[in-house]
Amino acid sequence: MLDHGARQHASFASPVYRELAYKMIEKLAQHYGNDSRIIGWQLDNEPAVQFDYNPKAELAFRDFLREKYHHDIKALNDAWGTAFWSEVYSSFDEITLPKTAQMFMNHHQILDYRRFAASQTNDFLNEQCLLIKKYAKNQWVTTNYIPNYEEGHIGGSPALDFQSYTRYMVYGDNEGIGRRGYRVGNPLRIAFANDFFRPIQGTYGVMELQPGQVNW
């Protein structure tokens, strides 16, 4: 969940944000699209799937559900198992965004929300790529994902020429060995990332690697 002051605190569901972002991207593409010094474009930096509580995100989530369940609220209720704990919805307009602070949230709702959030990220990247390709005929376009494999958005923007990733082998104490993880790390991370990214399109890129200890 993001708010002002956090990294990547943008709402991809906001039409105003998208409009202004697309204007800026198109101006850049017009200026650099035929520049022989430019070989390619990296969209954003480590785009991710975020819990977005912007009012526009809630409206877009409802539209996402309407399309997925073919405007049939009963189909949604059946899929989400809402008869349990009296969660039944009478209308798509009653549905709110899942709030992580609440106990015992409906996991089907959370899963659909994560799919919605992934689709927002993918669509935003795809639209940026298509804008650039209007002007950049001989330049590739990619983005660099953090390999958060469970978020489901990686590889979901078909306009990209190839997928790229960022990988830090030593960046924390999450290897089960305490703070030694900052020194030892896990070199298998890069092998796993290679195996994950290569099958998506055959070609893939590595945009960030860690040369030593973390510096942020």
Question: Where is each model-derived feature located?
Answer:
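Polysaccharide-binding and catalytic clefts of secreted carbohydrate-active enzymes
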Residues: 2-189
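Active-site core of glycosidic bond-cleaving carbohydrate-active enzymes
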Residues: 163-167, 179-181, 186-215
